[in-house]
């Protein structure tokens, strides 16, 4: 009986403890954008790779019929300023993960569009693009 009470007490402590959730905003960094050919037409089915240069971890995404891709990378607060490499076929571009480490309320990320062999980063368009994709009203 005592062993059962100890196990129940331990279970209560484990269940009641806050768990470090991987889905928390301060562990996510989202890179999204569109891949188009040089004429501006969407390139569906393209593989988009985002490499975390510090660790070599590779995150893959694919474009949909509109050429849209979304890649979510696991980056913690300590990763602000970290270098990432975005690759679509032979085209690649170095990115810097820019965010305020203390801000745990706003989504972290950037928008990157690939047009032909040209890569254009639009960090200011990230939140509006994400809100549109999620169907949320823009702030």
Give, region by region, the residue ranges found by the protein language model.
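Positively charged n-region of N-terminal signal peptides that target proteins for export
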Residues: 1-4
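Short, acidic Ser/Thr/Gly-rich low-complexity loop/linker segments typical of extracellular
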Residues: 54-72
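Edge beta-strands of extracellular beta-sandwich domains
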Residues: 93-102
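Short, ordered, surface-exposed loop/turn motifs in non-cytosolic proteins
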Residues: 38-53
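Beta-strand-rich domain onsets/edges
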Residues: 17-39, 125-139
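N-terminal export leaders
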Residues: 6-10
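Short Pro-Gly-centered beta-turn/loop motif in secreted/extracellular proteins
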Residues: 70-82
């Amino acid at each position: 009986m005592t062993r059962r009470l100890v196990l129940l007490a331990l279970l209560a402590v484990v269940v009641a403890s806050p768990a470090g959730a991987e889905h928390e905003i301060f562990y996510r960094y989202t890179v999204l954008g569109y891949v188009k050919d040089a004429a501006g037409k969407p390139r569906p089915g393209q593989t988009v790779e985002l490499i975390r240069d510090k660790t070599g971890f590779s995150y893959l995404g694919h474009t949909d019929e509109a050429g849209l891709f979304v890649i979510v990378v696991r980056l913690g607060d300590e990763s602000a300023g970290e270098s990432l490499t975005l690759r679509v076929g032979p085209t690649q571009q170095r990115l810097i993960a820019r965010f305020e480490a203390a801000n745990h309320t706003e989504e972290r990320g950037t928008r990157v569009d690939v047009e032909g062999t040209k890569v254009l980063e639009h960090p200011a368009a990230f939140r509006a693009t994400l809100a549109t994709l999620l169907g949320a009203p823009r702030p």
